[in-house]
């Protein structure tokens, strides 16, 4: 009886341990796969440095273009679209974390003026919801609602990202004014080359850490290589580890120099940033402008009518 209870207890503990392990694995994998925007959020209080450089460029080293389109002017308390385009060749494949090839993902950060923020769901029209798709935006910080991040998301489906933005109303927000404001944006396609801790990803080129001769190249069981480099002058041996992904450019017996590329550069993506301007327009100014135009048109009409009346009087006097 005691042995049976002991067996049941051991079985219960094993089941519980396996369940916990599975949960930890799932949580860890989810965090890793969705961590790309989090890198900047965790490491930087503000994604835009004093120089104007967006911090995403610290990990995505290649430069690629992006395009941002916003209305020239908007009225207070109005929902409008900010459209970000991240162009790239859809046929390209990137190196994934496991060394295999796969489609490119994209991500973006949108830095709006103070007071502008993500539009609430009940203010977004059905047409705009259709343009947005299944994208889920989040604030860079709980207290920075004007800075939005998105990604990573599939590039083939979302190379054009539509942000639904709500403009502020100076009548209810004291820090909002009827002015021209700058908008900054950064967008990447593909994985980065550097992790926040400074280590390299497998989506970049690997260089030799020593001058010498390649004595041996060991192909690792899970992919990647270990390259033994021997210095001919003192016999010192250095081992460079290459993760799965980059293609090897050197062979055994080859003489190499310090910082010489050992692999190709597999990166096909890159990061770009841009800016635009938007005017928060005062409705009273718009009404005043419309009134002015109406007055000018009305004055022109009266002038034409007066001229025709004067011509008729002249013609009558000449006939008389």
From Swiss-Prot:
Gene Ontology process terms (BP): photosynthesis
An example Gene Ontology molecular-function term: iron ion binding
Note describing how the cofactor binds: Binds 1 heme group covalently.
A single Gene Ontology CC term: chloroplast thylakoid membrane
PROSITE patterns attached to this UniProt entry: CYTF
Cofactor field: heme
The entry's keywords: Chloroplast, Electron transport, Heme, Iron, Membrane, Metal-binding, Photosynthesis, Plastid, Signal, Thylakoid, Transmembrane, Transmembrane helix, Transport
Family: Belongs to the cytochrome f family.
Function: Component of the cytochrome b6-f complex, which mediates electron transfer between photosystem II (PSII) and photosystem I (PSI), cyclic electron flow around PSI, and state transitions.
UniProt protein name: Cytochrome f
């Amino acid at each position: 009886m005691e042995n049976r209870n002991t067996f049941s207890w051991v079985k219960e503990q094993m089941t519980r341990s396996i369940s916990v392990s599975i949960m930890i694995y799932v949580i860890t994998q989810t965090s890793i796969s969705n961590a790309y925007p989090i890198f900047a959020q965790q490491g930087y209080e503000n994604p835009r440095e004093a120089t104007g450089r967006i911090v995403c460029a610290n990990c995505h080293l290649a430069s690629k273009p992006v395009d941002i389109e916003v209305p020239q002017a908007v009225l207070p308390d109005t929902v409008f679209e900010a459209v970000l385009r991240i162009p790239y060749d859809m046929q390209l494949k990137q190196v994934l974390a496991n060394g295999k090839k796969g489609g490119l993902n994209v991500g973006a950060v949108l830095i709006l003026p103070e007071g502008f923020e993500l539009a609430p769901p009940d203010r977004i029209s059905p047409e705009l919801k259709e343009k947005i798709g299944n994208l889920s935006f989040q604030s860079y910080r709980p207290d920075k609602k004007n800075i939005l991040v998105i990604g990573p998301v599939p590039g083939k489906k979302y190379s054009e990202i539509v942000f639904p933005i709500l403009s502020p109303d100076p009548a209810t927000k004291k820090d909002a004014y009827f002015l021209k404001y700058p908008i900054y944006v950064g967008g990447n396609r593909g994985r980065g080359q550097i992790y926040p801790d400074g280590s390299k990803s497998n989506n970049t080129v690997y260089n030799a850490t020593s001058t010498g001769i390649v004595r041996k190249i060991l192909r690792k069981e899970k992919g990647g290589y270990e390259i033994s480099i021997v210095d001919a002058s003192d016999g010192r041996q250095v081992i460079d580890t290459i993760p799965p992904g980059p293609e090897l450019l050197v062979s055994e017996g080859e003489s190499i120099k310090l910082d010489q590329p050992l692999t190709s550069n597999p990166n096909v993506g890159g990061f770009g940033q841009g800016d635009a301007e938007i005017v928060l327009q005062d409705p009273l100014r718009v009404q005043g402008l419309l009134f002015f135009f109406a007055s000018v048109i009305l004055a022109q009409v009266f002038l034409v009518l007066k001229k025709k009346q004067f011509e008729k009087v002249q013609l009558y006097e000449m006939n008389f």
